[in-house]
Amino acid sequence: MMAALYPSTDLSGASSSSLPSSPSSSSPNEVMALKDVREVKEENTLNEKLFLLACDKGDYYMVKEILEENSSGDLNINCVDVLGRNAVTITIENENLDILQLLLDYGCQSADALLVAIDSEVVGAVDILLNHRPKRSSRPTIVKLMERIQNPEYSTTMDVAPVILAAHRNNYEILTMLLKQDVSLPKPHAVGCECTLCSAKNKKDSLRHSRFRLDIYRCLASPALIMLTEEDPILGAFELSADLKELSLVEVEFRNDYEELARQCKMFAKDLLAQARNSRELEVILNHTSNDEPLDKRGLLEERMNLSRLKLAIKYNQKEFVSQSNCQQFLNTVWFGQMSGYRRKPTCKKIMTVLTVGIFWPVLSLCYLIAPKSQFGRIIHTPFMKFIIHGASYFTFLLLLNLYSLVYHEDKKNTMGPALERIDYLLILWIIGMIWSDIKRLWYEGLEDFLEESRNQLSFVMNSLYLATFALKEEAHNKFHDFADRKDWDAFHPTLVAEGLFAFANVLSYLRLFFYVYTSSILGPLQISMGRMLQDFGKFLGMFLLVLFSFTIGLTQLYDKGYTPKEQKDCVGIFCEQQSNDTFHSFIGTCFALFWYIFSLAHVAILCTRFSYGEELQSFVGAFIVGTYNVVVVIVLTKLLVAMLHKSFQLIANHEDKEWKFARAKLWLSYFDDKCTLPPPFNIIPSPKTICYMISSLSKWICSHTSKGKVKRQNSLKEWRHLNEKRDENYQKVMCCLVRRYLTSMRQKMQSTDQATVENLNELRQDLSKFRNEIRDLLGFRTSKYAMFYPRN
């Protein structure tokens, strides 16, 4: 029988020389006895082997014959092979759906049948298992199949449910079938949750608890599940990616897994947006506001561009979504507005347009102040024109700062409390305008969103320094009226402090120009790289300060006892030709010496001592400490800093287009609303538009207390609700179209890959096997059920 099973092997005629020698004829050191130490299951009978082999070959008629002959129940239809697979599992793996239906009708059972079908992504098998009804019951066995498998021998992770496994495979069709069965998922708790359930699970098995949370989030991050269960898939992907990013910082053991899932959610949102085919669909998607977000009622009634979804994408740091081509094209359209012809102009005309607007920006601001709703005012209101006008206003402010040093009077040099000049009052007007602009932005955006922008942080510090400068100048003018040489002034004289703050504020004012280069495709990526390098330098600074503090303490303790009295010193300072170690007698002096030693500005004599004879050991220790500092800081840490900066630059360079477009979009969005149209100092003048809005709001408030006003208010609310419902309905229609296109594109990608080729080959093999068995049965080649073991000539 075994020879028939293996016809290619001639066991009887095998040469004895080809077989290994018996252990008795060899030395014990030359052979190694092999023994199966695993659990040996009960060997199957011949009929059971035939039954499993027929299922594996896909022989429907043989399986049916064996099951019909098993009236006495001698055959164990739930038997398993050496791999632990029963007939149902084998049939599912081979995708023999007709045999699977036959086995289920005869009562074959498998606890993990549904999981095997989902894992193999056999959609037909999943459908059969979910809809199968036993002969003695009118209800399908779905309840048992949908239970979580807790068998550690199963190939997938423990505590796995069918819906979780289907989401891991990202199979849209299978998930659709499972969701019709009213399935549910346990809501994952926070990592630091101390509830009774989480405490018990952590105490019992912390690894299992963490892995189960990871499986749940891997399920939730499935694009197919997001499309099926989320009314707003884009918002769901945004929120889930933020949660996964936060989890990656907490559960560092699974950081790579959570970061990969967060990246998957970001790419899904980007790919879903890429399915938009026209500007109308993009407008509906990018202007949609969720129920949790504040809604601009006036903007909704006026059909104004609010770009709420785009602002939310920037808040959640969705760089892939914002830098997507469709989104960027829509942003360009909104950015130029009625100046759309500017992009098609030659370079010379572009420069002339910018210079003209930059020179006549005060006139343009006055025109908008007088007639904001006119055709000319609407052109000025476009984001592109606002950007140029605000930039020209800021350049004028910098010009006033340069003029400030030119109008400085030498005769007031020793005046302890000089009066403010005319240019000071001009600067104060600009500063008040910039502060008012920041206050309005803070009011509409909120403190958290306002402080997230580094541009707002720099503006806040700069304006605070200018306010402190002029406040100190005014205080000095009121308190001091004398003349004296500056060297006789107090170190913290208000005028001196004001000049120091003013100098630092001037530096920040010019550094603020870096934020304007984001609009340039050449300088923008360099600015982003510089910002990332500054972050890396902050990390490096913490390590450097620790090393500096360690060596400073050691050198100070070593040389403090050898401090030379002042009258015996030849000179002081680390740049002295006759330098001594007296620099190291204090903590501050040692810090300065070691810091400048990095830049080779400390004298070589820093290694010498002024100890007397017999204290060579202290001299050697001091030289060894400084030498070690030289190796650790000058050689190792500085090279580490260079490597960190190079890595940051390379990281930005690899994603240059994405990083630049995201940074540019953040800058552009600050000019899209109508909150800060006029630049400083014209924004501090009450405009007719503001007065009209105030009068309109006041009249509405007064009318709301009358009977007619209440009716009008109710009608306005009904109109607003109707528009809101219509907006949500349009959004759902567009989203359904995007989901269908996304599924179609994914199906086309799968058909063009090797996986589709393998699936086609499997289908061809199944068809050929089924055709062979049918022909054999029709021609009567099978004389007995054991004939399939024997080869035919």
Curated annotation (Swiss-Prot):
Q: Which pairs are disulfide-linked? A: 571-576
Which residue stretches are annotated as topological domain Extracellular?
405-422, 476-496, 559-623
Q: Which GO terms describe its molecular function?
A: inositol 1,4,5 trisphosphate binding; store-operated calcium channel activity
- PTM entry text: Activation of PRKCA induces phosphorylation of TRPC1 and subsequent Ca2+ entry into cells.
**TM segment ranges:** 387-404, 423-439, 456-475, 497-517, 537-558, 624-644
Q: Which domain of life is it from?
A: Eukaryota
Skewed-composition ranges (Low complexity): 15-28
Q: Where in the cell is it found?
A: Cell membrane
Tell me how this protein sits in the membrane. Multi-pass membrane protein
Q: Which Gene3D superfamilies match?
A: Ankyrin repeat-containing domain (1.25.40.20)
**Control of this protein's activity:** May be operated by a phosphatidylinositol second messenger system activated by receptor tyrosine kinases or G-protein coupled receptors. Also activated by intracellular calcium store depletion.
Spell out the residue ranges that the record assigns to ANK repeats. 46-75, 83-109, 111-156, 158-180
Renumbered to this chain, region (Disordered) spans 1-30
GO CC annotations on file:
cation channel complex; plasma membrane
Q: Which residues lie on this side of the membrane: Cytoplasmic?
A: 1-345, 380-386, 440-455, 518-536, 645-793
Q: Which residues lie within the membrane without crossing it?
A: 346-379
Give GO BP annotations, semicolon-separated. Answer: calcium ion transmembrane transport; regulation of cytosolic calcium ion concentration
Sorted alphabetically, which keywords does the UniProt record give? ANK repeat, Calcium, Calcium channel, Calcium transport, Cell membrane, Disulfide bond, Ion channel, Ion transport, Membrane, Metal-binding, Phosphoprotein, Repeat, Transmembrane, Transmembrane helix, Transport, Zinc
| The reaction(s) this protein catalyses | Ca(2+)(in) = Ca(2+)(out); Na(+)(in) = Na(+)(out); Li(+)(in) = Li(+)(out); Cs(+)(in) = Cs(+)(out)
Q: Where does Zn(2+) bind?
A: 189, 193, 195, 198
Q: Which NCBIfam families match?
A: trp
Subunit info? Heterotetramer with TRPC4 and/or TRPC5. Forms a heteromeric ion channel with TRPC4, with a 1:3 TRPC1:TRPC4 stoichiometry. Unlike other TRP channel proteins, does not form a homomeric channel. Interacts with TRPC4AP. Interacts with ITPR3. Interacts with MX1 and RNF24. Interacts with FKBP4. Interacts with PLSCR1. Interacts with PKD2L2. Forms a heterotetramer with PKD2 with a 2:2 stoichiometry; has distinct channel properties separate from PKD2 or TRPC1 homomers alone.
Q: Any idea what job this protein has?
A: Forms a receptor-activated non-selective calcium permeant cation channel. Forms a heteromeric ion channel with TRPC4 or TRPC5 that has reduced calcium permeability compared to the homomeric TRPC4 or TRPC5 channel. Also permeable to monovalent ions including sodium, lithium and cesium ions.
The record's similarity note reads: Belongs to the transient receptor (TC 1.A.4) family. STrpC subfamily. TRPC1 sub-subfamily.
Protein's name according to its UniProt entry: Short transient receptor potential channel 1
Q: Which organism is it from?
A: Bos taurus (Bovine)
Q: Which gene encodes it?
A: TRPC1
